[in-house]
Structure formats: structure tokens, C-alpha cells
Amino acid sequence: MKKISLPKIGIRPVIDGRRMGVRESLEEQTMNMAKATAALITEKIRHACGAQVECVIADTCIAGMAESAACEEKFSSQNVGVTITVTPCWCYGSETIDMDPMRPKAIWGFNGTERPGAVYLAAALAAHSQKGIPAFSIYGHDVQDADDTSIPADVEEKLLRFARAGLAVASMKGKSYLSVGGVSMGIAGSIVDHNFFESWLGMKVQAVDMTELRRRIDQKIYDEAELEMALAWADKNFRYGEDQNASQYKRNEAQNRAVLKESLLMAMCIRDMMQGNKTLADKGLVEESLGYNAIAAGFQGQRHWTDQYPNGDTAEALLNSSFDWNGIREPFVVATENDSLNGVAMLFGHQLTGTAQIFADVRTYWSPEAVERVTGQALSGLAEHGIIHLINSGSAALDGACKQRDSEGKPTMKPHWEISQQEADACLAATEWCPAIHEYFRGGGYSSRFLTEGGVPFTMTRVNIIKGLGPVLQIAEGWSVELPKAMHDQLDARTNSTWPTTWFAPRLTGKGPFTDVYSVMANWGANHGVLTIGHVGADFITLAAMLRIPVCMHNVEEAKIYRPSAWAAHGMDIEGQDYRACQNYGPLYKR
């Protein structure tokens, strides 16, 4: 199978075209800006798969229509999906801009006094606004000398934020969401909206009945040698939790072994359906070997599958993690209960950070008063204003135990290329595999159980679709919280102690949906949410603006909000601007 190439970032150095001294005096400085931008991005950003980002610089500086067209021809042949235009001087606005309406674009105008880079920036942005092709503005806060080749910190922040979000847009385009099954228990997110994927994300939806998974398992449409490797790996690494089922529902050793085998097979077959597997072609199964070009997937499970077959918890947990029997690798994005909208939030988070994502129910708001009444203990520290219990039936990425460590030795979740084998082993050691509760899952299964370490910064997100409006994005930055063991045990037992738990405390602003923790819970738009490592809400906001998805709820500092310059023309209130601009421009891939 031919590997689909990764999108690249195109750098467009633009210049004043007047010869006889003007252009000649600017060539080196302008091209050096392009090279510095490319070097920064190549050094600081990777694709979600871990590959280094490639930047393509125009062959010459661009002064007008001819050189602009030559640049576009080069970019078109090299899979450029994002562009950054750079200049230290005045150039000819609409004659030099990137006119591709589907491609995220930014312009960095050098803040210097010798030549008017800011004037070109303003003129070019005016052209973008007038033509209905939004672009992001980058302009340093402080004046630099003409021979200063450094990139100021504020410029760097915008360049990198734009590049991360732009690459996410380009990476999703042309891929598919694999819907295995249909609607799970009436959950709206599993009513997969093809128009949303096509118009806003540039993706297709591949709908496959769960009987295809059954067929692959029953007819051995998988790598049998890999299954043996997976079973041996599980035997070595799985630590089993208490079977809380009544005696009549407990399975014997042989039955448990069969459940484990099928759970691992589900992971293998869903993965193969997503990305393909050349080993299947070697078995003569060429069609099945191709996969569905899926960058994300969802598995319905409940109840049409789980009432008679093992649930998807083990398969989903392992696929969503950064490691399995094949070692450390890029995590997949697989949504529980085929909640495609939570799957999209997972996809956004993974593309922006390269890390595994925690899929969870936004289950319970615990007020300080309720916690004290139930446990006799008071919440304190980050938890003092109350907490939200994020928990689901064992499908969260195992990275979520936060047994990985950052450069300061603090608990975190890292992109897979930074994870050591010891850290992967620590996440596995922190996880118990509990027999599924029969009342929920009659077909059995194993649910992963872990507790997220406290004090870790997270960003919780969710995409919802509103009739008459379209998709909206919710964002809540906050922290995981570590509770005293006795308190945790009491609260955890009131829900389901066989599932993974993250205690989450959002950062409060005292206003609107962030007035208090209760308000965050009350304003959340669905039963599911996603945790992405770090306070990265600003990156989500930039990405949403590129896709024309308004943000209906966030607690990101206003200074960090970065949207296309044309948003400022849509009113004076920053969030109202977002709604009006998204409505005005419509979805990125209008259908």
C-alpha cells in the first residue's frame, strides 16, 4: 500500500518588486525571514505521528502575480496544506497573497522602521478580508532592528500556534471517520452527521456494521502470529482486579481466557479496519488489507454487541493508548459508544499535541458540602470549590494514569516519541483489568481501572451540534485532583469502582459558565468529554476558527485567543465576533 504523504507548511517570502536598488536590498533579509520561520517550525513541531514537519520555501521572493503563481505551482506539487507569508517590507497586497480558500494562512509582517512590513501586513489582510479568505496576523510587539534575525517570543508563540492548528486542519482533510455500528443507546453523538464531517472537517464517513468485526474475528481475518504475541504480552503485563459480579455471573478460567482473546482481537481488527494491514494481503485478503483510511473511529458496542459479546473497553483502551504489544507507537482515536462528536474532540486534541486522549463520562459534580456529608472530610487545594468525576467504562487511554514524567519530574502524558519503555510499563502497572459488570455487559469483557495522578493540567473539550447553528466547541481548562485515599474510595464506590477515574477541577473565572464548578457541569453540552494534557485551550480556539466552529464556552485568557484578523470586523465583543464570523464565512469546506 502506498503511504499517503503528510501535509507540509509552505513559506512565502514576499518583497517589494521595484528594481534598481529596492528589491535587491531586501532579498537577503526577506529570504532569511522565511528560513528562520522554517527552522523554528521544524525544530519545535512534529506531526501527530511523530514525523518531523517539512517546510517548503518558495524558490524566489514573491513580488507579484508571476512569482506568486510559480510558488503556488511548487506548493501544489508538494502537498503544502498550510502557508505562512513573511516580509520585512512593503509589497503589493492582493498581488502577492495566497488565494487558496481551503488552506489555513498567516502573514508575518516584520516590526521594523527601515521598511514598512506592518503596512504590507495591513494591506494584505484588508485584501484577504475583502475577498472573503480569512488570514491570521502576526506582528511583533516590539520594534526590531533591520539586521535582527531573531524571532521574538510573541511572534514565535503565534507562529507555532498557527502551525499546530493549521497542520491539524490539513491532516484531517481527505481522511475518514470509521463508524463501526450505529447509534448507541440513543446517544446523540453516535447519530453520525456526514454533513458535519464533510463540510467542516473535509472528511468522509465510512459506516460499517458491527457484523464486519464479527466476520473478521470468526473467519480469522487477522494476523494470527500477532494474536499470539498480544496474548503473551497481556499475560505478562495485565494485572487483574476484583470480579465484583454475583457468583452466578462469574466466568471460569477458560471463559475468561476466551474473553481476553476476543478483546485483543477486537483491538487488532478495529485497527486493521482503520489503517489497513499488509499482512492480510499476504493471506490473500487484499480488499480487507487496505483499511478505510480512517484517522478516527467509533465503536457502538452497547447494546447490540455487548449483550452477547465482550465489550469494547479493552480494545478501545489499548488503541487509544501510546503502547501495546508492538511497543510504543502513535495512539489511535477510537470513541466509545461511537460518540463521533467526542471522537472529533479527541482527534483535535491528538492532532494538536501528539498525545493520547482520555475519553470520559462527565459523570458527577461533587460540591464541597456533599463531599463532606458523605465522607466526613473537607475538600482542599485545587478541589476546594468542588470537583467533577470523569469516569467511563474502562476505555480511557492508559496514559491517563499519568505515570509518565516531564522534564521537571512531574506527572504528565507525553507524545509517544518522548515516552520511555519504563513509563509505558508504569502506566500498565498502575492499571487493573476488572471483569465487566454483568448487569451492564452481559457478554463480558475487561474494564481498565486506574486513577489519574493529581495536579496535572488538563483541557476538557467537547463538540456539540446545534440544529440551526451547526457545530460548537466547549473548552474547560483545569487540573486533575488527588483526593485522600479514604475519600476517593468512598466516592468512587458510589459509581463503579471497576472503571478509570479522573477527579477534575476546572479553573474558575467567577463569570458565566465558569462562575463555579457546578456551572461548568451544568453548561456542559453532552454526557461525554475529552481530557487533553496541558492548558491548550488557546490552540483549540485557533483550530476552531480555522474550521469555522464557534466556541460557546471557554476559560482561556483573552490575551491568548488567536483568530483570523477579519474576526475583529464582526463586532466588539470577542465571543460574539466568533459566532458572527463563523456564520458569515460558513464551514471551511462548504457543501
From Swiss-Prot:
Coiled coil location: none
EC category name: isomerase
Catalytic activities: L-fucose = L-fuculose
UniProt KW keywords: Carbohydrate metabolism, Cytoplasm, Fucose metabolism, Isomerase, Manganese, Metal-binding
Enzyme Commission code(s) on record: 5.3.1.25
Pathway listed: Carbohydrate degradation; L-fucose degradation; L-lactaldehyde and glycerone phosphate from L-fucose: step 1/3
Main location: cytoplasm
Localisation per UniProt entry: Cytoplasm
Active-site annotation: 337 (proton acceptor), 361 (proton acceptor)
Protein family: Belongs to the L-fucose isomerase family.
Protein purpose: Converts the aldose L-fucose into the corresponding ketose L-fuculose.
Protein name per UniProt: L-fucose isomerase
Organism: Salmonella schwarzengrund (strain CVM19633)
